[in-house]
Amino acid sequence: MTEAREAVLSPTDVKTILGLCSAEGVLVGGQALAFWVDHLGVRRPQELEIAVTADADFIGDSALAKKLGEALGWKWWIPNLDDATPQTGKVTHTLADGSIKQIDLLSGVIGLTTLDVKRRAIDMDVPEIGPLRVMHPIDVLDSRIHNLDLLPGKRNAAGIAQGALATAMVRAFISHELESRGERVALKLLERVAAVAAEPGAVRIFLLYGIDPLNAIPLEDFRTNAALHTKLWPQITERVSAQREKMRRLIQTAKSRRK
């Protein structure tokens, strides 16, 4: 039996879904990346020009799945208590050609703690949509890296392009925060990105695909913190570079032993 093809949500679909969801769930995954990319005016690569992702993912409960399904007139499904799934619900709509549009409601995202994702999510008031909770940009980057590291099905051209796009998006976000809220706030974001870059999964993904979270730091925009340039940043790059070299050698040794 052939698995049904996933249909891409149209911009109108996404706007309607976000408006219905309001702030009841947290927008995560590829649609969170797409939201921030558009909000910050980041250029999409050719691979993601038509759509960053096909579906929409939210951290939310079964009541939200029911609400979305009924409001959209789409089918909705809620798992049984004994179903082994991270989904709390799913909303689908089958098109005439058999392809399926879908929304996933999740208890969490791989590699990140749900409580932290909810705590760091940013509340927005979006024109033509209304109130919305969106996954923090750095969590978006972190989740794209975890997907590439932990989910073989994500290691494709689109998944790699999402990782690179998330890096550019976070760079734009930090530049915006620098300009609007100052270096003290932006420095905390820099330190969080540095922590992401030092994670073993991020080190592996850098070695495999060249996706470098440190490229998300607009270092030249930090103009008043001399200690950052003379002390902190050299320490960060030295530490991350050492971890990358250590893992590179481990990978090379493992390959040699398999020969």
Task: Specify the residue positions occupied by each region the protein language model found.
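Compositionally biased terminal segments of proteins
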Residues: 1-259
